[in-house]
Amino acid sequence: MNASSNVSNVEIANKIASAAALFRKYFPDASVNFSPWDNTNESMQDTIDFAFHFPGWSPLIECRAILLQLRIENDGNGRVPKLLGIIMRGMIVPSERWRVATIGDWEMTGTHLPQKEQKDNLILVCKELYKLFSTTSAGNKN
């Protein structure tokens, strides 16, 4: 679900804004889109989705945009949802170039992987997102 559609109170709005700022701390050239989907349907309510667009294709990160999906468990009580996992996809229209998921071994896969420094920064973003949501998330070993 679009990040903008998940805002139901100030605490959730703060977490969403902080998540975007955290990403931009490591990738300051990226612009954030809080509504990456044209429409949001009921089947996507278990995610908070962002898109981060770069001013052009970046050979360092091997993409033009990154789709960031925060997998959540929302109990419907208006509190900040529990963060279950993170999926990032490096995209060049119309295809995915790489992906990393925080389920399993956190291994980055794909046909065109980012440079080491950018890979390390993407993993740091994931770790810091877990810290950001730690008030409602179960502990994560990474």
What are these regions (language model features)?
Residues M1-A51:
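Charge-rich, low-complexity N-terminal segments
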Residues A30-G85:
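Amphipathic, interaction-prone secondary-structure segments
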Residues K25, D29, P36, F52-G56, ...:
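Intrinsically disordered, low-complexity regions enriched in small/polar residues
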Residues L67-N142:
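Intrinsically disordered, low-complexity regulatory regions enriched in serine/threonine/proline
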